[in-house]
Amino acid sequence: MASLSLSSAHFSSTSSSSRSSISTSSLSPSSTSLPLLQSPIRRRYRSLRRRLSFSVIPRRTSRSFSTSNSQIRCSINEPLKVMISGAPASGKGTQCELIVHKFGLVHISTGDLLRAEVSSGTDIGKRAKEFMNSGSLVPDEIVIAMVAGRLSREDAKEHGWLLDGFPRSFAQAQSLDKLNVKPDIFILLDVPDEILIDRCVGRRLDPVTGKIYHIKNYPPESDEIKARLVTRPDDTEEKVKARLQIYKQNSEAIISAYSDVMVKIDANRPKEVVFEETQTLLSQIQLKRMIKTDKASPVQDKWRGIPTRLNNIPHSRDIRAYFYEDVLQATIRSIKDGNTRLRVDINIPELNPEMDVYRIGTLMELVQALALSFADDGKRVKVCVQGSMGEGALAGMPLQLAGTRKILEYMDWGDDETLGTFVKLGAIGGKEVDEEDDMFILVAPQNAVGNCIIDDLQAMTTAAGKRPVVLINPRLKDLPASSGIMQTMGREQRLEYALTFDNCYVFRLLYYLGTQYPIMGALRMSYPYRYELYKRVNEENGKEKYVLLATYAERPTPEQIDDAFSGKSRDQSKKASGIWGFLSSVFS
């Protein structure tokens, strides 16, 4: 088997940051935004979606697109169902926060549920309040009813759930089982008793700010704060030991109920290390489920995560619409998480300038879909296209960008003055940043022989500050200067700057090395999820499907991709010889 290529000269040009229904509201609209104009913009965006046969694809749902000659389907994972348990001071709260942020699960805590029901004055809340006022424990039947009600809500069904510290007894576990509430995994955070006691006894409360400190692990910032710290009543050694004893009795009782899905994690480590193990476990569950679904489902025209027939040019509206929406949702999620320097790398044939089927209109359609979506949310979006570059005989516009500004100007943005109000066109540079701009979409910024776009790009991001800047298919590798030699001065700094943009979306087709046909597979990443490696498999009657081979927390190297396709382990790959070993070394 020949080695595989990513059909791109800059496979390693960027790294991605560590990675749920998301709104673009995390972008702060400028004070001069005109909300009254959102209605016509919304109509225009919906019109574009209808024209492209857009279908919003929520996470973990199924949606079908129909074309005249085929049916394309996308099947996404079922949501995760997670239970987590841990003794007081085991770090359970921190891990819950990290899990929710990473996987978008609905966090369910019985304490929060009780307070919410009581505060809302519901029938269950009133019954619970009677027991709480009398100093009695709330009966299991009331707590179970609250938990079951919360799990039945649409957000928990769609996004999955994380049940925090519940059930606490075997009887509660049995009650949940009767209601068919079963977790995919039961995580037990394990910390030695002496460490737990030290964590609790060493805690101190600042009565002024309510902030919690630890005399050894997290000391106060000043002597003034230190002087006013107090020990919480429950953090005495005697009470901590009593709480631990109760926890042990309860946990031992429920371990048998979830022994088949229980995983014990050493939580006496830094929170980042603990979460890395937790994240791996949850990702493995997702991967196994995806593979199981692939095997159990009829293949026919089905695809998972990526469409088939990508060698058919021009791409159908359904295929284009899928990728536009896939890119959009990943970008929205990344911006919501506070990322401001983003890049999208997508090289389907119509968006790959190295192929003779490259279509500038498809790139412009993608940019328009992104711009209208954010404008629909009331944001002022500036779409930027670099101008003519180079010197003397080398002056001109990169082929990939030829005519893009005019195309954008002549595109149908609607009759509501969207273009010029919520969406404006500009060039790349610090002077192009206006105070009213909320975000910037840069169309394929790239270096040219004799000139480097990175200086202008850096000036623009500096002027933009914390406002999001999204690069669509950038090509930032160094090229020769007008004299024909590489621009060595400042090259290291330019490359470092290029790496400050994190991928929010990656889609790259895989070919045999040195070819662009046939497609052997694909690499996909949609923020904040893992990189997914697919292999294209031919089927009867000229059909095809994509089989998920592996997932990666970070962007896989060409060697890792070769190994996955050949079925080699890393130890075996080190012994590779012949043509395979030679091509692997070429990638190094």
Swiss-Prot record:
Catalysed conversion reaction: AMP + ATP = 2 ADP
Pfam families: ADK, DUF1995
Keyword set includes Transit peptide: yes
One GO molecular-function entry: adenylate kinase activity
Consequence of gene loss (knockout): No visible phenotype under normal growth conditions.
Binding site for AMP: R115, S136, L137, V138, G165, F166, P167, R168, Q172, R232, R243
Protein name: Adenylate kinase 5, chloroplastic
Species of the source: Arabidopsis thaliana (Mouse-ear cress)
